[in-house]
């Protein structure tokens, strides 16, 4: 289970009064927690490729976003692919590799199909209400300050749909003998 973009606002990392994270805090007590994990590159795509391959961006030659890793590294075995190759179910729910937000919400983006046993691409009302995104450069969402004050419940948003699906999958996996 990997989560990103949390900053140190979660309770288990010191917290912030506005962030209520009891479930993440409980998970952190039971699992591994990386407190000195640093970004390998100041862009999303190279950092994510580095995390999944174990290679520095200068080794992989992935220095920009919107790169399919197999074009640069056709024979690389990613972390999730290694688990999959050793009998684990490696399921991706939402974004792991780079994709443009909000444009690519609900599709594979720049994913690596060889890395996964199963995938799920959630698409919530935050995608269908894309026109409501405020951006300092209208219509440009990456590389500029932009946000959406989304209406609706958590379960209607892309992240809420992903969290609900993850819970369902974890319950399903717990009933099998296959590691996940």
Describe the role of every protein-language-model region.
Residues 1-180:
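Formylglycine-dependent sulfatase
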